[in-house]
Regions:
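Early transmembrane hairpin module of multi-pass membrane proteins
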Residues: 1-164
Length: 164
């Protein structure tokens, strides 16, 4: 008799921290609706899928999971398409500046994550308080700059700027 032993992969970030993604990702859905309202249908469609993949990914964060890969693909697709569409609005420079700030903060946060939460050996050496603070930092920075502020930049362009 062959026995298959399945090991449960350890999540990178405990779900008690990632559950707030369900709230912060609502802004992605809000931007999607705003896109439909302003006749940016393809971007609205892409953002609808990004909302779904974001929630699937943040339900349990595993390194290099299928949901992580799909979410990353959808994020990059939305990032590139939104950047291209912003060019056709009179305040594109504001959007591009804010996007570059958010991208810089994301990369800085990702670098810090690689030094902490992506390194089980380093996390094992930390006190539970330090681990707790790193999880909070990783999630809050990601949710604030990408789920909230970046989507607000998109909503600003659609609602306050004129298409040229």
């Amino acid at each position: 008799m062959n026995t298959v032993v399945r090991t449960r992969h350890k999540t990178l970030i405990p779900t008690r921290y990632t559950q707030f993604a369900f709230l912060s990702s609502l802004n992605i859905l809000r931007l999607s609706i705003c896109c439909y309202y302003h006749q940016e249908y393809l971007l609205g469609f892409l953002l609808s899928w990004l909302y779904i993949t974001t929630n699937l990914h943040w339900k349990r964060v595993y390194k290099r999971s299928v949901y992580w890969k799909i979410d990353k693909f959808m994020t990059i697709s939305c990032f590139l398409y939104a950047g291209g569409r912003a060019y056709f609005y009179d305040c594109a420079s504001v959007y591009y500046f804010r996007t570059m700030v958010h991208l810089y903060v994301f990369l800085l946060n990702d670098f810090w994550n690689k030094q902490t939460i992506y390194s089980p050996s380093r996390m094992a050496k930390m006190s539970s308080i330090k681990q707790h603070l790193h999880y909070i930092r990783a999630c809050v920075v990601h949710f604030l700059f990408l789920h909230l502020l970046q989507t607000e930049a998109g909503i600003y362009v659609l609602s306050q700027c004129k298409r040229i």
